[in-house]
Amino acid sequence: MKKKFKIIFPILVCVCFIVIAFIIIFSVCKNIKDKTVKVAFYGLSQDLCQAIPQEFVDDEKIIIQYDFLADGNLDLGTITKKYDMIFAWNGEVTQNLSKSAEKIPAKILENIPISLRDEYCVPILLDHFEMAFKTDLIEKTQINPQESFQSFTDFLQESKQYVFSPFFTYGSDERMLLALTGSFVEALGGLESYKNLIELMKTYENLDDFCDIGLNENGLCYADVLNMLKIWPKEEIIHPQWTIANRIDLEVFASDNQVACFYTNLSEHRKLKYEIVSKFSAAKMPVVNEDIPHCLIAPSVNCVLISDNSNSKKILKKLLTEDVQTRLSDKTMLAPVSYRAEAYDSLADDVRFLAASCEGGVEPDLFNAVFQRDNEKMTLIANQIRGYLR
């Protein structure tokens, strides 16, 4: 027995040394490999592409390489081979990349609401497609349009005696046109209907192929929303030329007090003159049935960890800290996602609250969800919608 032990013990010691040496070599090699972090920014504005990297980890031992990729066609296979992390508007691109992404440690997600936590694709800033209601008309009509979808339409009807176009948005903007129709689908049918619409738009190439397909068990279909919008000009609820209107048209009508409610997103809201926005109160889209799950249509700048680079995780962890979130909100005027970060203003703070309290969390608008890499198809569908509404 002792003889066997004398033979086995040195062998075990050698094996242990080999294992330890292997671990050390592996660790050293990984540290060398992780020293360089390759980061992609896809489809983000110049402001965002400047603000986000300014908050990265300041460590001379880490080399960060950036690539700024424009909207449009993108080879996801190349992205997964070339980069360690990517920042993009949440949508078709991030959802596809997240299927093979590195899992984000739970510790990193602790600073954000449960409704926003995603182990593979985490938001760092929020936008929001909103309704803006004229505050003096809420008093005049004695109707709270935020209470329900019925209250919303009642408000528009009652506002006809005060303004030329109770409702307004600029339908010449393809993204805004699609977002509006998507928001109405969500308001009428909830999260399930909205997600089903996204899948139909991904599947079919033409409006006629999917507009009559049911989105929920009640038979709601995309055509129901389009038909509602089609009769609104005849009922004098919306300007007859709204599908070709632009943001300047909105400014003109709103400045002249001829709009009771307009639809836009937080980013575009920031571009409107103070004399306009000061007369309006921004809110989420009212819904028909509060008893079913709903989401907030709030485009979010998300991060996906493509590789297991340890320094990528350090960067992401820092971006979600209270101080950094406060600075990012100040620089971008978007909503922070951190619980305790200070928001740029009450509008951004409201978006964060709505996102945290919404049972279905946040979902991208139709552009990001479906057409992020296919602007040609987006233009085709948008033109078909305009034709349908004539």
Label for each model-derived stretch:
Residues 90-98, 263-279:
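A ligand-binding cleft/hinge motif common to bilobed small-molecule-binding domains
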Residues 274-332:
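Extracytoplasmic/periplasmic substrate-recognition and gating elements
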Residues 1-92:
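Conserved N-terminal structural module of periplasmic/extracytoplasmic solute-binding proteins
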Residues 195-243:
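Glycine-centered hinge/linker elements that transmit conformational signals in sensory
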Residues 123, 296-298, 326-390:
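C-terminal capping/gating helix-and-loop segments adjacent to ligand/active sites or protein-protein/ligand interfaces
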Residues 87-133:
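Hinge/lid segment of periplasmic solute-binding proteins
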Residues 155-211:
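Extracytoplasmic/periplasmic solute-binding protein
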Residues 67-76, 150-153, 240-252:
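Short helix-initiation/N-cap motifs at beta->coil->alpha
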